[in-house]
């Protein structure tokens, strides 16, 4: 019997390294960029509050074969065959999410926190409806009705802020705006809120006008899961989150609720409403991260995240920097730089040259432009994942003060010596707390 004919194209394809060749060999430019990014993460202190460092297991799941699978629909109800194994991953992610947040329904398909919010809007609102969210200037998020965002274009977006005295959320203003504008949805949460939000008060206001309460817990979801931050439930009708940040998972989004009717609308809004096939490799990574978050050590991690943030804030205050609201209850803080006479953009760059990564950020009632700002946003999740404790974060605060004082005294073009000194000390600290030794 003759051997089956071997197609030359197939033979060539299988022998050309497609399934075996390393990234370094196949695409040296991307490999080089990836290695440089690995070096940056290893050798610099990450203080961006919305960033974290995932486990090797999460990265392995994200880089696995589930990236090949199209899976439109939901587990057990797919539009393609061959989904029996990716169904396992999504079902695990859903079940673990429900355990983490004590809720009855979870949709783990949103590709980002922004798409999770868009999914809720699609499920519960109509274009032209009124929404009430925190202004970006006060610490809100683009997707809560900011004018440049789709949420500010499709909806009549009314914005609330903070009190001028203590710079905390102005619940009386929210109540007044709700009574005046009758929004269909009130949004709690934001991207730069250092204090715990009063969800009960927000729901009370929502109920007076029959509005939905959406809690965007993207920044503090990890602390909700560990019990360090009050749960949005039973107050929220629905909650959204990213799956990175304090949850320490892959970049993605999620929607959770206890309301079955809302859950059905949300599922239809995500697929087929605003997304097609979900990213199954990312959902696998989410499942792994949620499993990690169910372990006792995750609670210990969140305890340290908060302790580190508070140590950082207190030491910065000792160094003469102002902290918005005077401190933090969470993982993040806003630093008011006006007393030092420097801007957020220049300070971000100076700290970056010293290998301390953070982001410029507007402060409440800031008069500077968004690309300039009078402040910085700092966070502790990534450093805590590395193993830093309060002592390390107090040292980091001292370095920040040193760079800021140098910038104020010397200017951007003459602060090299200070930045180089701090950069060397940062390297020594990072060497003591390595990440990804097998990469």
From Swiss-Prot:
Residues 1-20 are annotated as: Disordered. It catalyses: (6R)-5,10-methylene-5,6,7,8-tetrahydrofolate + glycine + H2O = (6S)-5,6,7,8-tetrahydrofolate + L-serine. GO terms for molecular function: glycine hydroxymethyltransferase activity; pyridoxal phosphate binding. Its EC number is 2.1.2.1. The record marks 244 as: Plays an important role in substrate specificity. Its main location: cytoplasm. Keywords: Amino-acid biosynthesis, Cytoplasm, One-carbon metabolism, Pyridoxal phosphate, Transferase. Pathway: One-carbon metabolism; tetrahydrofolate interconversion; Amino-acid biosynthesis; glycine biosynthesis; glycine from L-serine: step 1/1. InterPro entries: PyrdxlP-dep_Trfase, PyrdxlP-dep_Trfase_major, PyrdxlP-dep_Trfase_small, Ser_HO-MeTrfase, Ser_HO-MeTrfase-like, Ser_HO-MeTrfase_PLP_BS, SHMT-like_dom. One of its GO terms (cellular component) is cytosol. It is found in: Cytoplasm. The modification N6-(pyridoxal phosphate)lysine is found at residue 245. SUPFAM superfamilies: PLP-dependent transferases. Its cofactor is pyridoxal 5'-phosphate. GO terms for biological process: glycine biosynthetic process from serine; tetrahydrofolate interconversion. (6S)-5,6,7,8-tetrahydrofolate binds at residues 136, 140-142. Homodimer. Belongs to the SHMT family. Catalyzes the reversible interconversion of serine and glycine with tetrahydrofolate (THF) serving as the one-carbon carrier. This reaction serves as the major source of one-carbon groups required for the biosynthesis of purines, thymidylate, methionine, and other important biomolecules. Also exhibits THF-independent aldolase activity toward beta-hydroxyamino acids, producing glycine and aldehydes, via a retro-aldol mechanism. This is Serine hydroxymethyltransferase. It comes from Jannaschia sp. (strain CCS1). The lineage of its organism: Bacteria, Pseudomonadati, Pseudomonadota, Alphaproteobacteria, Rhodobacterales.
């Amino acid at each position: 019997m003759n051997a089956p004919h071997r197609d030359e194209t197939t033979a060539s394809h299988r022998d050309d390294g497609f399934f075996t060749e390393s990234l370094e060999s196949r695409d040296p430019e991307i490999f080089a960029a990836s290695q440089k990014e690995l070096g940056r993460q290893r050798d610099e202190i990450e203080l961006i509050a919305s960033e974290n460092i995932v486990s090797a297991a999460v990265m392995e799941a994200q880089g696995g074969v589930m990236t090949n699978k199209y899976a439109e629909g939901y587990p057990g109800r797919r539009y393609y065959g061959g989904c029996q194994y990716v169904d396992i991953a999504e079902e695990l992610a859903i079940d673990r999410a429900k355990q983490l947040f004590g809720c009855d329904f979870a949709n783990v398909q949103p590709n980002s926190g922004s798409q999770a919010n868009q999914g809720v809007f699609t499920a519960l609102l109509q274009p032209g409806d009124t929404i009430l969210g925190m202004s970006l200037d006060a610490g809100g998020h683009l997707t809560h009705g900011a004018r440049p965002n789709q949420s500010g274009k499709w909806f009549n977006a009314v914005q609330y802020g903070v009190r001028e005295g203590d710079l905390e959320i102005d619940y009386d203003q929210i109540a007044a705006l709700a009574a005046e504008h009758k929004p269909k949805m009130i949004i709690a949460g934001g991207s730069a809120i250092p204090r715990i939000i009063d969800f009960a008060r927000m729901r009370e206001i929502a109920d007076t006008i029959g509005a939905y309460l959406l809690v965007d817990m993207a920044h503090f979801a990890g602390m909700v899961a560990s019990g360090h931050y009050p749960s949005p439930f039973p107050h929220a009708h629905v909650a959204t989150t990213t799956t990175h940040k304090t949850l320490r998972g892959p970049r993605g989004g999620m929607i959770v609720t206890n309301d079955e009717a809302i859950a059905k609308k949300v599922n239809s809004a995500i697929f087929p409403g605003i997304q097609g096939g979900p990213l199954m490799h990312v959902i696998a990574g989410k499942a792994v991260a949620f499993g990690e978050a169910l372990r006792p050590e995750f609670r210990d991690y969140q305890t340290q995240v908060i302790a580190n943030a508070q140590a950082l804030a207190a030491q910065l205050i000792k160094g003469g920097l102002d902290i918005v609201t005077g401190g933090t209850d969470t993982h993040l803080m806003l630093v008011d730089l006006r007393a030092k006479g420097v801007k957020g953009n220049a300070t971000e760059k100076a700290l970056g040259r010293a290998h301390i990564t953070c982001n410029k950020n507007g402060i409440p009632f800031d008069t500077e432009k968004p690309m300039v700002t009078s402040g910085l946003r700092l966070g502790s999740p990534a450093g805590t994942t590395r193993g830093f404790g309060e002592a390390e974060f107090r040292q980091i605060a001292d370095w920040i003060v040193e760079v800021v004082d140098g910038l104020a005294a010397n200017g951007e073009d003459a602060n090299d010596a200070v930045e180089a000194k701090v950069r060397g000390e940062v390297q020594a600290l990072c060497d003591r707390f390595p990440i990804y030794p097998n990469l």
